[in-house]
Amino acid sequence: FNDRYIGKNVVVIGGGYTSMDCARTALRLGASSVKTYYRRENDDLIILPGELEELINENGKMIFKARPKNLIKKNNKLVGIQLIKTKLVKINNKYRLIDIKDSDFRIKADHIILAIGQKQHLNKNSKVNNKVFLAGDYATGATTLIDAISHAKNVSKKVDNFLMKRDLLHSHINDEDVI
């Protein structure tokens, strides 16, 4: 674990807990510049109070209303990223995020970290299909560590039941059993 590499010009994409952790960790690992880009506005961030201020105090930058468009490579090596500015518009009584025409811009980057929230659509057994299970934040979206651990424990029981060919209906997990 002593051989940690982080680029000098780091770009983080995202606006949540993980993006803040990634940006601040990159700074602590020696990155000269860390810029975090979020496609929405400050009020839409999903972070703890004070996290943005902590990022800025550590010399990180947060740029709002911009999203990635393309990676820029030279001789098969990452050298930058092309982004485009975004804006929120009301269309048919619904707000939608759209790209601003001709607002593309490029910045240097030798390390890009995608810290974007994604959530899967699952059936009631936390399965994507008959043989793939998901657990924790990937299955539920951003939650607390305790919730992620609880969900992972429940899903691990379901995986065990599936592999051992036990009936899921007769394998109840009590809340008291979940730490």
Where are these regions (language model features)?
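Short linear motifs in intrinsically disordered/low-complexity regions
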Residues: 77, 103-105, 126, 161, ...
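Rossmann-like dinucleotide/flavin-binding elements
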Residues: 1-49, 111, 115-167
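Post-kinase regulatory C-tail/linker adjacent to protein kinase catalytic domains
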Residues: 172-179
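A Rossmann-like FAD-binding core segment of flavoenzymes
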Residues: 1-6, 28-122
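Phosphate/diphosphate-binding loops
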Residues: 60-70, 159-171
